[in-house]
Amino acid sequence: MKVLLLGAPGAGKGTQAQFITAAFGIPQISTGDMLRAAIKAGAPLGLEAKKIIDEGGLVRDDIIIGMVKERIAQDDCKNGFLFDGFPRTLAQAEAMVEAGVDLDAVVEIDVPDSVIVDRMSGRRVHLASGRTHHVTYNPPKVEGKDDVTGEDLIQRDDDKEETVKKRLAVYHEQTEVLVDFYSKLEGEHAPKYIKVDGTQPVEAVKAEILGALGK
C-alpha cells in the first residue's frame, strides 16, 4: 500500500500515520528524516543536499526525488510506504509520476481552519519536560502553571494564532494544487482519493481511513 497522507498542521496527521503504518507494515517516509539519514550516512545525494542547506538554500527537487527513489527501493518498502509532507508542490508530484513512483491512495484529513486555530493556539507547553496542556480541552490545575513542577507554561511561537493562520494559508495553496493533480490522473497512475472528516474522534478517523484503504 503506497499512501500519501495530507493534512494541515494540527489535523492529527501524525497520529493517523502511526495507525496506517502499523496496519500495513509499511514505513513512514518524511523528507526531513530522509535528508538527515542521507547526510549522516555520507551518501552522495546527502552530501550534495548538506552543501545546499549549509549555504542557506532550498534542496532542489531532483535531489529530493533521487533520495525518495533510493529510499523506496529499500527492503522495508516492499509492502509500500507512507509519504508524509511529500510531495509538497505540483513540480514534485509531476516529477514523481515521471520517475515511475505511483501511489495507491491519497488520504486527506480535512479539518476546518477555525478548528485548527482553536486546537493549536490553545496549546501551552512546559519547556523543560515537553508536557502539554490545552486551555480548553486539557487545562492545567492552576492557570498558566505546570501540574507537576508549578513552573510557567508557555505558548510556542509556532502555536500563536497569526503563525497558525499563515501556515494554513501556505498549506491550502500547496494542497489544493496537489489534490487537483491527483484527481485528474488516469489509468494505472491514478490513486484512490480519500477525504476524511478530521473533526471526528481519533478512533473514528482511524476506522474510516483504514476501511477506505481496505483494512
From Swiss-Prot:
Per UniProt, the enzyme's principal EC class comes to: transferase
- Its EC number is 2.7.4.3
Q: Where does ATP bind?
A: 10-15, 123, 132-133, 200
Task: List the residue ranges of the region (LID).
Answer: 122-159
Q: What is its main location?
A: cytoplasm
Alphabetically sorted, this entry's keywords are: ATP-binding, Cytoplasm, Kinase, Nucleotide biosynthesis, Nucleotide-binding, Transferase
Q: Which residues are noted in the entry as AMP-binding?
A: 31, 36, 57-59, 85-88, 92, 156, 167
Give the GO terms filed under biological process for this record: AMP salvage
One GO MF term? adenylate kinase activity
Q: Where is this region: NMP?
A: 30-59
Pathway given in the UniProt record: Purine metabolism; AMP biosynthesis via salvage pathway; AMP from ADP: step 1/1
Name a GO CC annotation attached to this entry.
cytoplasm
The source's domain of life comes to Bacteria
Under Pfam families, the record lists: ADK, ADK_lid
Classification via InterPro entries: Adenyl_kin_sub, Adenylat/UMP-CMP_kin, Adenylat_kinase_CS, Adenylate_kinase_lid-dom, P-loop_NTPase
Subcellular locations according to the entry: Cytoplasm
User: What is this protein for, i.e. what is its function?
Assistant: Catalyzes the reversible transfer of the terminal phosphate group between ATP and AMP. Plays an important role in cellular energy homeostasis and in adenine nucleotide metabolism.
According to the record's subunit comment, the protein's assembly and interactions are: Monomer.
Q: Which family does it belong to?
A: Belongs to the adenylate kinase family.
Record remark: domains: Consists of three domains, a large central CORE domain and two small peripheral domains, NMPbind and LID, which undergo movements during catalysis. The LID domain closes over the site of phosphoryl transfer upon ATP binding. Assembling and dissambling the active center during each catalytic cycle provides an effective means to prevent ATP hydrolysis.
Can you name this protein? Adenylate kinase
Starting at the broadest rank, the lineage of the source organism is:
Bacteria, Pseudomonadati, Pseudomonadota, Betaproteobacteria, Neisseriales
